[in-house]
């Protein structure tokens, strides 16, 4: 009987703590051996942790509009590279054309893991993991 309360406490704590871990995922969906550069107009963006996100409309080789879904690093990493929420929200509100460099999805669908972004005013930011200072 003495072990029931501690055991239940451990089980309940584990259940509560595992949920945030399940929300985060690996980058295995992205092909880190390749990079793709895509230009298009921002349709939507989200500035949040654990990842920021950009949806952008880009033209394919036939002139068709394709929605690209871009996942980026967390907001702390972005801010550390000089890229901030106001920049992203202003670009989204103004429906600016941006250029992104991404590791593409392995599935071939239009999307990728953000490595760099160039805004309409020409400002560029390298935000991918290979640009992060490990110190």
Question: What does each model-identified segment do?
Answer:
Residues 7-20:
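Bacterial N-terminal signal peptides
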Residues 38-42:
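Conserved hydrophobic positions within beta-strands
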Residues 48-58:
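Short aromatic-glycine-enriched beta-strand elements
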Residues 66-78:
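Short, basic/aromatic beta-hairpin or loop at an interaction surface
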């Amino acid at each position: 009987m003495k072990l029931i309360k501690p055991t239940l406490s451990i089980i309940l704590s584990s259940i509560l703590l595992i949920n945030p871990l399940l929300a985060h995922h690996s980058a295995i969906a992205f092909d880190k051996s390749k990079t793709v550069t895509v230009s298009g107009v921002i349709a939507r963006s989200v500035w949040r942790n654990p990842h920021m996100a950009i949806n952008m409309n880009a033209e394919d080789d036939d002139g068709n509009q394709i929605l690209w879904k871009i996942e980026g690093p967390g907001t702390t990493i972005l801010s550390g590279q000089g890229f901030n929420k106001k920049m992203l929200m202003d670009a989204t509100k103004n429906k600016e054309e941006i250029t992104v460099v991404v590791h593409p999805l392995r599935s071939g669908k239009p999307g990728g893991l953000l490595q760099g972004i160039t805004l309409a005013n020409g400002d560029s930011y390298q935000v991918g993991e290979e640009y992060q200072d490990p110190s």
